[in-house]
Amino acid sequence: MSTLEQWLQVACAELGIDPASVDLRAVLDLTRDVARGVDRPAAPVTAYLLGVAVGRGLAPADGIARLTGLAGSWAAQHPAGEQPGA
């Protein structure tokens, strides 16, 4: 078991979450896309926002799809090095 998988088990136990309910690959893909297409610090913030939305009833897959799409459109509208509002 990798360190990430071990951490997932421990963190889920701490929060009372079934580890099987976490689509780890999808979350990692989302954070990768946000880090590359938006900004690195936006990745963990986006993961947190996804968690808040899921806690409020949004289906995880729907949230991931919406945020991945948003990150893709952001990257297309804001070429590398271009700062919005600058």
Language model features: what each stretch is:
Residues 19-57:
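Amphipathic, hydrophobic secondary-structure cores in small proteins
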Residues 15, 35, 55-57, 67, ...:
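Generic helix-packing signal
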Residues 1-25:
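An acidic intrinsically disordered interaction segment
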Residues 17, 40, 73-77:
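A structural signal for alpha-helix termini and helix-coil/disorder junctions
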Residues 9-12, 61-86:
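C-terminal binding/interaction regions
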